[in-house]
Amino acid sequence: MTQTQLKSPHPARDWPFQVIPLHPVLGCEIIGITLAQAVSPAIFAKVYEAFLDYQLILFRDVDLPPTTQVAFAHNFGEVQIHVLSQYHGYKEHPEIYTLSNLDKDGNPSGKHSDKGTLYWHTDGSWRERSGQATMMYSEIVPEVGGETEFADMYSAYDLLPPTIKSKIDGRRAIHNFDFSRTRRHGEDPLTAEQKAKVPPIAHPIVRTHPDTGRKAIFLGDHAEWIEGMDYEGGRALIEELNLMITPPARVYTHSWNPRECMV
């Protein structure tokens, strides 16, 4: 796909909006409708089709107060509440997880509020029921940095060598939030009560999406070890896979502007 094609609107099937691809592999911007229109059942059904096709959908220049954000998120299904309650930025809306490097006085702290998010991960893979999507909204963005990267896990599986596929098909990885936050990155944001709520959980390394029927890799930084393998061997395979499935050519890097909503 050429740069001209990436920047040109696509007429997009029978959708009541147009899409602009963000990257040759994944992601699109939706134009021609507002978020208020997108939540109507008839239009949202088409928005969801775009989400399934492109894996990422972006709305630019939108007002998204907490109440509206939670309401829009409910269109995708049950909205989960993050176990790290210290990041719940709105008392009335615990569904919203807030990340900021500003202190209580609004000044840059010089610290990243959640360093674990700097590594490749699948949001909420440490849950027994992992979510199908994450909704992000930008309020204040830095002049430099702060990008978010997304990798295509469909093609990650499709392009794996047959020898690697045979190693992982049918296997499960143990995802452990305490491992990824405490032992792996040297931070300990979880209280004892929070740790008890998120014990290690097993998920298939290769999952089939129920709506698209496509196979995808389900790994990332929260995956600690692999059932049926010795610990060190499983760790080595996870590290190898995490490198193989995130090559630059299949990664979209999003540079944020204020008032953007990404799902």
Language-model segments: residues:
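Non-heme Fe(II) oxygenase catalytic core, chiefly the N-lobe of the double-stranded beta-helix
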Residues: 2-261
